[in-house]
Amino acid sequence: MQEKSLQFQIARQCVFFVAFLFLAGGLTACASAPFHLAPPADVYEDAIPTGYGRIRGWADAAPDNLEALLEGRAALLKRRFADTIAAGQPIRLSYLALSGGGQEGAFGAGLLNGWTQSGTRPEFEVVTGISTGALIAPFAFLGPDWDDALKEAYTTMTTDSILIPSILKGLFGGLALADAAPFRRTIENFATEEMFRLIAAEHRKGRRLYVGTSALDAARPVVWDIGAIANSDVPGALKLFHDIILASASIPGAFPPVLIKVEVDGKQYSELHVDGGVTAQVFAYPAQIDIRDIDKLMPTGFERIIYVIRNTTDRPPYENIRQRILPLARRSISVLIAYQGIGDLYRIALNAKRDGIEFKLASIPVSWDMEPEESFDQKYMTALFALGERIGREGIPWRSRPLAADSEAEIAATN
């Protein structure tokens, strides 16, 4: 089956770029780009977005104020679940991690809608999103009241509403092969002030919404606390929310990086942020954090479940590859992305096992064989949404291991 997602189209164009490298090299000096001054290497970890406090962290390390965060978290949980604690019952918490996948995010959007219809969808204490998962995450966080808006987002999306091709500009010194202005407008249409206000309210209750990006200068994954941003009262906070979602889904080469202003010791700098999928296809929490540490601060126990929705199949489908540079490059990148995602799933599953959290995974059935005709194919996305919705409504075949799919159950789900 041919994979026609945006990542693979970009692979083709990148190879094309190499062929024109010397021709374009003489012209790149004339190209313009936003001024970018990265923080010095010895202080970059201390950078904070200009005007904000602690609204983000590194996804590959525990925060330096972890003890204070755990104590604050315990205090919130004691207030929220006072009745449960008084009754001597365990606190039940559900977490949701949403992966990348481009237009295949329609599956996750449909699954959430169908899950609501089944009457078994829980309220999620924490929601995380990467790339297309970052687009879904705010809707999932706010619950079933936003299902219709989520459906609209993923069944009306088209290539024209996401990008404007600018291949020649990209080849001759530009920052990308496409203009992301339509994508920003699409994000602004769905990530509204009302959504932002409601995220802030849920954050104050103790729930958390996190979005992942990749900091190119630092070559590290970044986790943004969207609720903290929404509660910051900093002018332009809504724009930063839009910037983060755009960055999380900005495939390098396809879209330009998103420049975010930061400061260190009163000095102004900037960072380049791109697709969270560059550093992780899906994330939950850093392995350096042991969730059980919070249990020691609580008078009762926990029952925790982490649900992972992977917006792709387990592995790339079998394909007879032509021995040409473009098919070889496309297939190699496809396999690289797929196995990066598998590694991420194993990390989440192992951390969950260590911390006593039940792990549940759902992904696109291996029997799904419809092919998209373009980068964001509305017909394809609508069909994939419908598949996810039906699976969610009829009963999601959750798996307890990253690659332990029950093939018969998956095949039955698509029949």
Residue positions per predicted region:
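N-terminal secretory signal peptides that target proteins for export/translocation
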Residues: 1-12
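Patatin-like phospholipase
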Residues: 31-125, 141-415
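Aromatic (phenylalanine/tyrosine) cluster motif
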Residues: 8, 16-22
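Catalytic nucleophile serine of serine hydrolases
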Residues: 102, 130-131
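C-terminal motif of bacterial Sec signal peptides marking the signal peptidase cleavage site
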Residues: 26-29
